[in-house]
Amino acid sequence: MADGNTPHVAIIPSPGIGHLIPLVELAKRLLDNHGFTVTFIIPGDSPPSKAQRSVLNSLPSSIASVFLPPADLSDVPSTARIETRISLTVTRSNPALRELFGSLSAEKRLPAVLVVDLFGTDAFDVAAEFHVSPYIFYASNANVLTFLLHLPKLDETVSCEFRELTEPVIIPGCVPITGKDFVDPCQDRKDESYKWLLHNVKRFKEAEGILVNSFVDLEPNTIKIVQEPAPDKPPVYLIGPLVNSGSHDADVNDEYKCLNWLDNQPFGSVLYVSFGSGGTLTFEQFIELALGLAESGKRFLWVIRSPSGIASSSYFNPQSRNDPFSFLPQGFLDRTKEKGLVVGSWAPQAQILTHTSIGGFLTHCGWNSSLESIVNGVPLIAWPLYAEQKMNALLLVDVGAALRARLGEDGVVGREEVARVVKGLIEGEEGNAVRKKMKELKEGSVRVLRDDGFSTKSLNEVSLKWKAHQRKIDQEQESFL
């Protein structure tokens, strides 16, 4: 935590390792480039996970972490969606946060700034009590942020379920969106998850700024729109890409097995297949994907989890409860042993995406994974599952960074479609076009992080504001001595 007049920022990530990773990278940048100290304040409804501890314990001493007591969610139905559980966890952690800020204030170590993510805006209540500047870190892209900023207006003007809309919604700066592609909580406006999303979005106006994990080359038109001043809209700063800089919590045997296997594959020949830390497939979709990969004849590295009927079922527990290999089609491993490698639950994605044998990534379009692919120039097959991933997929396809696997009438991507899109990416003309676009975006992602780059300048602007507020807090504290 902060000593003396060192600028001090507190960060509250929402539960889930995917929320933590980009904020860790932000903390590193604040430390290395701007001399801040950072305190992570971790809410949860259970003891911290091994993955959380591994990530936080790997950080420099100037980045501290405090785990708040677990929030009591015993009254929350087991069927509650992840957005509801996350929001309630943060909201019910406010008393513990208030106590922590009181202690820090008494010790003259109160942070100047509090950074929360999408579901953490109720922590602004505590920030206001202690005159701490509230900011939002939006971990996804400016396209989805623009949609969310427009959501309260949509809520007022649209009476039906959004999924029932017959025409795409046109929002300035956004890719046209059909209702069924809206972020997951918007698919049922009567569900508590939608009410919590709307509640948090309506509090965005209380922030003094919104930091976005994207960059100008990826979304030039959207960024112009979202940065235009408007009533009740805080300044928006593009500071990305912030991506995982290395592996944490690795299973050493699996790590070396898959990386050594990649070492023996031809350049650009392997399709990496993974649905992130929280995504799972239905049993039928799991089988169709397996058979499609085999039918494609292309090399692949597939990270598998046991199938489930809920796309986000691994969100709070990324380890498969059952043996995922037992669900593979009979004879699949023998049939594909010359060209494929299957690993269970986890793989060192940061290292995999930098490997020269990787020629593509079949992804759930989580924004962390999407950005990791972009900074490494790896072309994508978009296979969104939950959260805002359908909107991410729309953006990635629209800019030419991804091909899209098409759903059948039964809602399943069939084996023939899997084989078609895999072959198209690895060896087809459409794959070559995506590779070319990804090369351009990779170059842009490097450019914006140079000393004179767009994202570097944006974070510089924010850091100057934060340092000024720290000086103000220090002066106020000294006046009481």
Swiss-Prot record:
Keyword terms: Glycosyltransferase, Transferase
Which Pfam families does the record match to this protein?
UDPGT (PF00201)
- What's this protein's function? Possesses low quercetin 3-O-glucosyltransferase activity in vitro.
The record's section on Gene3D superfamilies has: Glycogen Phosphorylase B
**Entry protein name:** UDP-glycosyltransferase 72B3
Q: Which GO terms describe its cellular component?
A: endoplasmic reticulum
What organism is this sequence from?
A: Arabidopsis thaliana (Mouse-ear cress)
Stored SUPFAM superfamilies: UDP-Glycosyltransferase/glycogen phosphorylase (SSF53756)
Q: Which InterPro entries match?
A: UDP_glucos_trans (IPR002213), UDP_glycos_trans_CS (IPR035595)
| UniProt similarity note | Belongs to the UDP-glycosyltransferase family.
Q: Where does UDP-alpha-D-glucose bind?
A: 277, 347-349, 364-372, 386-389
Gene name of this polypeptide = UGT72B3
Q: Its Enzyme Commission number?
A: 2.4.1.-
Output one GO MF annotation.
quercetin 3-O-glucosyltransferase activity
Q: Which CDD domains match?
A: GT1_Gtf-like (cd03784)
